């Protein structure tokens, strides 16, 4: 069996607003259910660290960025739909591919 990839993600939020907290909680739930032990999530508050938002060209929050594995993918706005998040970050395809070729046939 091939080693699972490690996923590096950044979530950009603007303070502790209800929308930011909802995005963070939903994302953590998705990651713990789907990628437990193989992800690292960095939460960046753009109000406290505006230079990071500027460097990464973040124009709206919440924004979720998958940094590794390449290619970099971003989702801006609502993160409540699990499938939308996984497809948007190009993670659902990886999940399906691993299942299809796992040799369980």
Curated annotation (Swiss-Prot):
Protein name as annotated: Circadian clock oscillator protein KaiB
UniProt cross-references to NCBIfam families, sorted A to Z: circ_KaiB, PRK09301.1
Family label: Belongs to the KaiB family.
Miscellaneous: The kiaA gene has been eliminated from Prochlorococcus during genome streamlining. It has been suggested that the central oscillator in Prochlorococcus does not have to be as robust as in other cyanobacteria because the former live in specific niches of the Earth's oceans; they divide exactly once a day and at the same time. Thus gene loss and changes in kaiB function compared to other cyanobacteria, can occur.
Domain notes: Has 2 forms, fold switches to a thioredoxin-like fold (KaiB(fs)) when bound to KaiC.
Subunit structure, as described in the record: May undergo a major conformational rearrangment; in the free state forms homooligomers. When bound to KaiC switches to a monomeric thioredoxin-fold (KaiB(fs)). The active oscillator complex is probably KaiC(6):KaiB(6).
GO BP term, pick one: circadian rhythm
Gene: kaiB
Its biological purpose: Component of the KaiBC clock protein complex, which constitutes the main circadian regulator in cyanobacteria; it may modify the ATPase activity of KaiC. May be a metamorphic protein which reversibly switches between an inactive tetrameric fold and a rare, thioredoxin-like monomeric fold (KaiB(fs)). KaiB(fs) binds phospho-KaiC, and perhaps clock output effectors.
Keywords: Biological rhythms
Lineage of producing organism: Bacteria, Bacillati, Cyanobacteriota, Cyanophyceae, Synechococcales
